[in-house]
A protein has these predicted regions:
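Long terminal segments
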Residues: 1-33, 95-193
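N-terminal low-complexity, intrinsically disordered segments
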Residues: 18-58, 422-424
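A structural detector for short beta-strand units
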Residues: 33-41, 61-67, 87-90, 113
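A short glycine-rich beta-turn/N-cap micro-motif
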Residues: 46-51, 70-75, 107-111, 120-123
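Beta-turn initiation residues at beta-strand->coil junctions
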Residues: 53-58, 65, 75-83, 126-130
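Intrinsically disordered, low-complexity segments enriched in Gly and acidic/Ser/Thr residues
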Residues: 110, 347-383
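C-terminal structured interaction module
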Residues: 118-137, 368-418
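Extended, low-hydrophobicity segments enriched in charged/polar residues
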Residues: 185-358
Length: 431
């Protein structure tokens, strides 16, 4: 079988067309420079590609998408370049088994199998025989080292990963070809173009503390940010702020730490009001909810927000929109002085978990009428811990705000996901 190979700067998955076709020489130059490019493999007489490969060495990433004759994506393969430049980790793979030619691409009822692998030998295999809404069976995948890793081919020497899926029994013959340019190839790449996986990105975090801003959380169509509440202060004499779930195992210390100047910092709640019809009251009522908490390091505005990473996180392994943060199985998080972490955590356990009635009020204080629950204080160092309620168990990202000069100005935790901004001037997002 002859496989035609063409190159482009990007691939538009919605329209299944390349963006900005390039010659093989330019693709080779981009490969050497680590810049992203795509490889499109086609067969004569077939409209849909056999497979498309996105290469971006600067992002440690190679992705392979396989298409069937109907133009539906059947397989996704995510390869990662780590410390050994000669091999790639098979980080993530998903296979979709469409039940017939009439089933739409990515149909929720499509059976699928997903496999995640990690360089330390761990992994997870999930089977969904009835699709996303059916039962899910999770097991540890049994794969050898050769199955976990694959050789990194040189430019122009990559195999057709989908040869078996397309029924090829003999190695294909590759022929270089020039891809046809789409009519809209001028200007910037469409936002729908395939890009290397990115970890979760910040939304309008600073705006959540700005009165008058209109947002939606997806459930409430319109919410209006009100003046943030200030709930006391937190002392961090060690200069290292801990953000963690105080209710889980901490053998290795707090989940997240952020260096800050030693000092005492304001604790805030971001709040938003919304109006809805209450069946009990039989009238419109207005409710104000806390949507985020923040430790304010400086009054300077945040120029950027970035998700904090845990000590063992490897950003090269992150999937699209993957989060990191602190874990909780008791719907609780905290800001604390990492230098006094152990004694502060012991006081938290004695006061909230064990309910010790004899705790000195100088070291343990309940906080009422707030998402902040309590404060503990280490008398030896002066360091403090302030626990706050989350809206459930799981992992909560920690967002670090920095000034134009790169200094930390705030550390925030969103309690119910990332809201979206609504247009100004009283126009709804749907208008």
């Amino acid at each position: 079988m002859v496989v035609e190979v063409g190159y482009a700067q990007a691939w538009d998955p919605e329209n299944r067309v390349p963006w900005r076709p390039i010659y093989v020489e330019e693709a080779r130059e981009r490969d050497v420079a680590g810049l992203p490019y795509v490889v499109v493999c086609r067969a004569a007489g077939r409209e849909a590609p056999l497979e498309v490969r996105l290469v971006s060495w600067r992002d440690h990433y190679v992705g392979v998408w396989v298409y069937d004759a109907q133009g539906r994506r059947t397989d996704d393969l995510d390869l990662r370049l780590l410390d050994d430049p000669t091999r790639l980790l098979r980080r993530y793979a998903v296979r979709r088994h469409y039940t017939g030619p009439e089933m739409a691409e990515f149909d929720e009822a499509c059976p699928r199998i997903t496999v995640e692998l990690f360089p330390d030998g761990k992994g997870r295999r999930e089977e969904e025989p009835q699709g996303e809404r059916g039962r899910r069976y999770s097991t540890a995948p049994r794969v050898s080292d050769d199955e976990r890793w694959c050789h990194r081919p040189a430019f122009g020497e990559w195999p057709l990963f989908s040869a078996r899926e397309h029924g090829l029994t003999e190695p294909p013959v590759f022929e270089s070809t020039e891809l046809a340019a789409a009519a809209a190839d001028c200007g910037l790449a469409p936002p729908t173009c395939w890009h290397p996986p990115r970890p979760a990105q910040p939304g309008p975090i600073g705006e959540l503390f700005r009165p008058g801003v209109r947002v939606t959380d997806g459930y409430h169509p319109e919410m209006t940010v009100v003046e943030p509440r200030r709930i006391g202060t937190l002392r961090v004499p060690s200069g290292l702020l801990a953000v963690s779930g105080p209710d889980v195992d901490h053998k290795d210390g707090p989940h997240i730490t952020v260096p800050v100047p030693p000092g005492e910092y304001v604790l805030e709640e971001a709040q938003a009001s919304h109006t809805y019809y209450c069946e009990w009251e039989r009238s419109e009522v207005t409710r104000t909810d806390t949507i985020a908490v923040r430790l304010l390091v400086s009054e300077a505005p945040a120029a950027t927000w970035k998700m904090a990473l845990r000590p063992d996180d490897d950003i090269r392994l992150f999937l699209e929109n993957q989060i990191s943060g602190f874990d909780t199985d008791g719907a609780t998080g905290c800001f604390a002085d990492a230098g006094a972490w152990e004694p502060l955590l012991a006081l938290f356990d004695r006061g909230l978990i064990q309910g010790d009635p004899d705790l000195d009020p100088d070291v343990y204080e309940d906080i009422s009428d707030s998402m902040y629950l309590l404060r503990t204080r280490d008398q030896a160092s002066g360091g403090e811990l302030a626990a706050f309620a989350t809206t459930g168990d799981g992992t909560y990202p920690v967002w670090i705000g920095r000034s134009e000069a790169g200094e930390v100005v705030g550390v925030a935790v969103l309690l119910e996901g990332m809201p979206e901004l609504l247009p100004e001037g009283g126009v709804t997002a749907d208008a």
